[in-house]
Every structure is written in structure tokens, then in C-alpha cells.
């Protein structure tokens, strides 16, 4: 089996096909930006994009991923050495405290902005509501998404 992750093809024939994508990314491929939070798909820390859709990688086995699927992790947001506008906004507004949820927050925010480049505050709240932040940085997260929308090309 092969996976297209961040526009690179990875051969995972030697990996148990029932293994969750999160652990393949982290343990087998060394892509450790995607975080483990709850292991049950509730918190959003493990969010990646599969064909542009935010997906909880802790609950999806690699066998459930279509052969032609494109997976993007937080490592795949930056292009040509330049931070993605969402990453830049999260840094500018000093969003992270503990950082546990940040990769998932950024992946959900990116998916929102790719679908709706000018979301309202309510749109942001709705899109981000299933991403939990232990530190309660929800106001700064919303501000960062608004800032990122202005930075998007």
C-alpha cells in the first residue's frame, strides 16, 4: 500500500493495515507534528486533511484510506520554506500555550479558510468547535483565524 502524504509517496506495505493513521504518521514515517490527544476522535489534536477534509487520524485505519487519497499534515502546510498564513497568524498572535492542540487547530482552520476565505466569527466558531484546547485559548484561536484570512493570497 502507498500513501500520498504532503505530496510525497510513502510505501507502507510492511505496516499493519489496521494501524491508525496517526501512529503510522508518527511512529513509522517520523511526521510527529500530528498530535495524540484522546485516541477517540473527540478532541481534534490529531486532525489531518484527507482530500481536503479535516479527518481525525487517531481513529482511521490506513486500510480505510482510498489509494488515490491525498493526505496533508501540519508539516505539509508550509510551502517553499514559507509558513502558511494560518501558521504565521498563530505565531503572530501567540496562540499556543501548551501546544498540544495546535497542529489540529491549524489543520481545522486551514480547511475552513480553503472552503470559505472570509468566514464570520460564527463560521469560525462553528468550524472550530470540535477542536478542544486544554488551555482555553479559544479567543486567540478565533483571532488568529481572522488574521490568517487577511494573510491568505
Question: Which residues does each predicted region cover?
Answer:
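Signature of N-terminal electron-transfer/Fe-S-associated modules in redox systems
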Residues: 1-153
